Curated annotation (Swiss-Prot):
InterPro entries: Met_Sox_Rdtase_MsrA_dom, Met_Sox_Rdtase_MsrA_sf. It comes from Methanococcus maripaludis (strain C5 / ATCC BAA-1333). It catalyses: L-methionyl-[protein] + [thioredoxin]-disulfide + H2O = L-methionyl-(S)-S-oxide-[protein] + [thioredoxin]-dithiol; [thioredoxin]-disulfide + L-methionine + H2O = L-methionine (S)-S-oxide + [thioredoxin]-dithiol. Its EC number is 1.8.4.11. One of its GO terms (molecular function) is peptide-methionine (S)-S-oxide reductase activity. Signal peptide: none annotated. SUPFAM superfamilies: Peptide methionine sulfoxide reductase. This is Peptide methionine sulfoxide reductase MsrA. Keywords: Oxidoreductase. Belongs to the MsrA Met sulfoxide reductase family. It holds the Pfam family PMSR.
């Protein structure tokens, strides 16, 4: 069995985030869902109505010998706007806020270092939260691999 690690990012709509990361060499699997809230096993409806406190996230299992956590962080920073609180594009709400959830002390340190680098290069305040990972709750099946199922990826990654 290959040694794997997990990364979790909230960067707006989880459909787009999953589409971005699932195509990366070294990423073994992706799953969209929710993290950071107070309700166990929240539904998409509860999250969208702001009733659970969760963030839409992509849960990434990867092989660190092929893709580094810092590479995933770079994709995270370069593919959403970390300066807009509770919003990404047309998607508005707390569930769309920018988050990095870490599992290890090394991930925390790398996330903080990358945050500082991005902040130094920006005239705007970076609002990305860096938090210890909590329970991950998978979203309903119809959300998983959404763009792949629809064969309608309008994204250009």
């Amino acid at each position: 069995m290959t040694n794997t690690e997990t990364a979790v990012f909230g960067m707006g709509c989880f459909w787009s985030a999953e589409e971005l990361f699932r195509k990366i060499k070294g990423v073994i699997s992706t799953e969209v869902g929710f993290m950071g809230g107070t309700v166990k096993n929240p539904t998409y409806g509860q999250v969208c109505r702001g009733k659970s406190g969760h963030i839409e996230v992509v849960n990434i299992t990867y092989n660190p010998k092929i893709v580094k956590y810092t590479d995933l962080l770079n994709l995270f920073w370069n593919n959403h706007d970390p300066t807009t609180p509770n919003r990404q594009g047309w998607d508005v709400g707390e569930q769309y806020s920018s988050h990095i959830f870490y599992f290890t002390e090394e991930q925390r340190l790398l996330a903080e270092k990358s945050f500082e680098k991005i902040q130094k290069s920006s005239d705007l305040r970076i609002v990305t939260a860096i938090k210890k990972a909590s329970d991950f709750f998978p979203a309903e099946e119809y959300h998983q691999k959404y763009f792949m199922k629809k064969n309608n990826s309008i994204l250009n990654f």
